[in-house]
Amino acid sequence: MAAALGASGGAGAGDDDFDQFDKPGAERSWRRRAADEDWDSELEDDLLGEDLLSGKKNQSDLSDEELNDDLLQSDNEDEENFSSQGVTISLNATSGMVTSFELSDNTNDQSGEQESEYEQEQGEDELVYHKSDGSELYTQEYPEEGQYEGHEAELTEDQIEYVEEPEEEQLYTDEVLDIEINEPLDEFTGGMETLELQKDIKEESDEEEEDDEESGRLRFKTERKEGTIIRLSDVTRERRNIPETLELSAEAKAALLEFEERERQHKQGRYSSRRGGRRGGPLMCRGVGDQRRESTERGRMKDHRPALLPTQPPVVPQAPPPPPPPPQQQPIRSLFQPQPLQPLLPVQHPHHPSPPQGMHMPPQLETPRMMMTPPPVTPQQPKNIHINPHFKGTVVTPVQVPLLPVPSQPRPAVGPQRFPGPPEFPQHTPGPVPNSFSQPPRLPLQDQWRAPPPPQDRDPFFLGVSGEPRFPSHLFLEQRSPPPPPPPPTLLNSSHPVPTQSPLPFTQPGPAFNQQGQQPVFPRERPVRPALQPPGPVGILHFSQPGSATTRPFIPPRQPFLPGPGQPFLPTHTQPNLQGPLHPPLPPPHQPQPQQPQQQPPPQHQPPHQPPHQPPPQHQPPPQHPPQHPPQHQHHHHHHHLSVPPPPLMPMSQPQFRPHVQTAQPQASSSRMQCPQRQGLRHNTTSQNVSKRPMQQMQPTAPRNSNLRELPIAPSHVIEMSSSRCSATPSAQVKPIVSASPPSRAVAGSRSSQGKTEVKVKPASPVAQPKEEAKTETEFPDEDEETRLYRLKIEEQKRLREEILKQKELRRQQQAGARKKELLERLAQQQQQLYAPPPPAEQEEQALSPSPTNGNPLLPFPGAQVRQNVKNRLLVKNQDVSISNVQPKTSNFVPSSANMQYQGQQMKALKHLRQTRTVPQSQTQPLHKVLPIKPADVEEPAVPQTPRVASIQGRPQDTKPGVKRTVTHRTNSGGGDGPHISSKVRVIKLSGGGGESDGFFHPEGQPQRLPQPPEVGPQPARKVTLTRGGLQQPPHLPAGPHAHSPVPPGIKSIQGIHPAKKAIMHGRGRGVAGPMGRGRLMPNKQNLRVVECKPQPCVVSVEGLSSSTTDAQLKSLLMSVGPIQSLQMLPQQRKAIAKFKEPAHALAFQQKFHRHMIDLSHINVALIVE
């Protein structure tokens, strides 16, 4: 759809945009800037994907002419904006009208009239304006500076203004938008209605055209306007001139009629085929309306983006999805339209965030809708959906309901809606509107990237349709499993009155035009989405969290990719806490809670895929919502680097992250599952975040990255192969799934960005789903039979979708695993120590035995245990697939053995998981579990000690898989061991922080895992390291991560410090847990281990040597550390075995040169015990 939309958009006003869009230089400059500056902010990550690909490219291409034109034609632009805002208002005001669709069209028409004239006057300029607006939107959401730079590469001066202005504008716009929404609602209701009928026909073509143009340009137009000082004045002027827009509608009507006629022919044909082709007949109809809406939304976004800025981050995250389509430049634009949809999600976030802004605006749904959502709604149903809630008899009531609950709901809703994601975002935003908003959006951005981006075409609609599930359900569900979104729609639809907040967004975005029709479409879209999700398993990180932004708001966006994982972790971790608090908070906000149950029921069906993730957001959001502000900040910090902040921030942050990720993933790729499918782009596996990724996470995400990468891979954050599996186990959904989702994400990340996101999406959804079921019941009283039936159908569809996604995910993972196994087996054949696997098995057994003891203690929360259990089970499955994959790689020495061992471990882990969820985690997934499972570490040390050699070899493999597992388990432990996670995460961060700068506690873990997968490839040596130092390292890692001083243990140090990533992985699973919970115990055991191992380390195995590396070079390297006894080169195996005279030298060499690059080849240095 993105391509189709892009093409048609490009054809119309978009043609100019398209040409400029295609400019290679412009795109590069944008990317460069986006990369530099986007990376600066959390949202920037998303921006990179989205703005970079779509917005920034367009903007940079058009920035010179268009920006100048913008400045020169600020009046026109203002009018355009006015029309946009007018549209926004009209949407709300007109919501009274029967046709939300018309309403949107109307608004769009007005803006379309002006814009059509405007566009005719400045085809490029207008497009540019749109783009500029979109860019500004991002800019404002983002640091504003980076964004502006990114999208206004050529406008340094303007950029400066933008940067300065955006913040003011953000605040100002928010206020203005609120006012605007309030005033125009009344003013425009009449005018818009009048226009509605007149322009209805026109609007289709105009809005379609605008959609194309606005998707690309209008969006940037809005961004630019918002960023530009002119934009600031625009906001004010727009407010004043909104009536003008209506007035203009008379004059512009003629021009618009022509323009619309022309565009309709151009675009209707195009859109028809595009939208129809993409979405199907009904979808096409909806598409037209959606596009209209999108264009209107864009107009609104233009106007509202400033207002949305604080709240806009969610929008931006949604917008980021366009980046996935960026390849299709016009698709980007079309994505922009979908983007609005996704912004829709964010808008919904803005929706809720808007409440924070305009909490005083009980109509906030309306206002937010206008403010935040309206912009998104303009392009898609989001706004319409908002309108629908108002306009629908039912919707109006819901709107009112949200009004009351909005204040309370925002936060509580966060929890419930977190699963939807958008709600969470909104809720997130409510408390900490700016922070929450910007941060959740960040994740959403990436998450969106994760899941929604690929399915963006549908996502927008889903956003529109799923708008109710909104980000969380929508993106999460959407990305994770299209079915979940529909349930939220139903839930929201029926729940609409009750949890209007989420429902409203949902209704507004989704049902706005078709609230009722759309739901039918939903089913269609759902299927489509499922298709999308499968296609973009990662789809987001995004939904990774849409709730995408909400479910995975934290996860994908900020740490987009790590947060995804982190978020799942946080949610996992927080979930236990949040789950308790969440429910209470939720109940207080009665509506939110109903919504939560409501929304969650769909997720529950989704649980296998999305539940883990989604639920955590839902659970977490409320509790965290209140602290979300700080968490959001923390998220920021985490995003940047939470090494230190993680502990304090992590607890809150993590939940937030998770929610973020989850929201993001729903937004971006609400759940890994959706993300994966959506983000299939990013992550194959289960694809939210997005999500650090969504791209894989996971962030499902996830999604949703090391951070970013992860987000995209999964949103970052959302990566959960495991998560998917975890999701499969609804039991573990809340915590396990959350934790699973991140791990899954990591696995998926290893496997593929898609998987990661997909999984992540799944987790969020699953968790949310159970609640949703409750919610369904809770909200059922308020629901009419029709709504309930809708919801039930949607839930069923979600379930089916989840199953399908799960199957796909598993298939993907299995295939990936098979590939990895083949690769690893090949490597293993080349490597020695195939005998080690059996000892590892023993070790595993031993570890498992201790694990129960330790494992039980590890399970701090019953929830955690259950979660871990489910998660472990899922992880075990995943690990079989994903770890098998990793293991083969990891166990280069003993590929088959490693696999066996791994499987054996997994089997044991399964057993243990069932017995002691934590234990298996600590063992099978010690790294992950170890964080929470100190006992795991302890037992682990014992195990490693007993079969030191075997342990080292087998363990390393275990650890290696552990690395993968580590992420997975990490998530688990995160979910299971909420409290421990902080410290563990910290440790992980310290040791693994290097690996994952995200610094997101869990996100970090996941991102690391994602990165680790890549590392897994080059991890033959790492495996070796694991074999010797690795095994020790995991235990030592705790100490090492805690203080690399464990260096004395040498092995530990080497693995912990040198293979920081590896160590982190290990530490995560094993060592970290030790240092965290039993930092000291572990060190002792580590020391023992070291002692046992010390005799062993004289021999160093250097793997992954470049064929051009000579023994002389290698010898000089070795001699630089210490004297060597012998050096044996095995060129056919691309490895060398050297024996040092002193074990300390071997350790030092391993520490110094592990993952060192020689002749463009990264060598893996492992200590070999003789």
Swiss-Prot record:
- Feature: compositional bias, Basic and acidic residues: 20-36, 289-306
Instruction: Give the Pro residues compositional bias ranges.
Output: 311-329, 419-433, 481-490, 554-568, 582-630
Residues that bear N-acetylalanine: 2
Cellular location of this protein? Nucleus; Cytoplasm
GO cellular component term of the entry, any: cytoplasm
What positions belong to coiled-coil segments? 789-835
Q: What does this protein do?
A: RNA reader protein, which recognizes and binds specific RNAs, thereby regulating RNA metabolic processes, such as mRNA export, mRNA stability and/or translation. Binds a subset of intronless RNAs containing GC-rich elements, such as NORAD, and promotes their nuclear export by recruiting target RNAs to components of the NXF1-NXT1 RNA export machinery. Specifically recognizes and binds N6-methyladenosine (m6A)-containing mRNAs, promoting their demethylation by ALKBH5.
Record keyword Transcription present: no
Per UniProt, the keywords (alphabetical) are:
Acetylation, Coiled coil, Cytoplasm, Isopeptide bond, Methylation, mRNA transport, Nucleus, Phosphoprotein, RNA-binding, Transport, Ubl conjugation
- Fetch the SUPFAM superfamilies from UniProt: RNA-binding domain, RBD
Q: Which residues carry this modification: Omega-N-methylarginine?
A: 1028
Residues bearing PTM Asymmetric dimethylarginine: 470, 1028
Q: Pinpoint the RRM domain residues.
A: 1098-1170
The UniProt entry, under PANTHER family, shows: RNA-BINDING PROTEIN 33
Give the highest taxon in the source lineage.
Eukaryota
Protein name, UniProt field = RNA-binding protein 33
* Start-end of Low complexity biased regions: 335-348, 357-372, 394-403
Q: Where are the stretches annotated Disordered?
A: 1-152, 199-221, 259-708, 721-784, 833-863, 942-1050
What are the BP-aspect GO terms?
A: mRNA transport; regulation of mRNA stability; RNA export from nucleus
Primary localization class, coarse: nucleus
Q: Where is the composition biased (Basic residues)?
A: 267-278, 632-642
Gene Ontology molecular function: lncRNA binding; N6-methyladenosine-containing RNA reader activity; protein-macromolecule adaptor activity; RNA binding
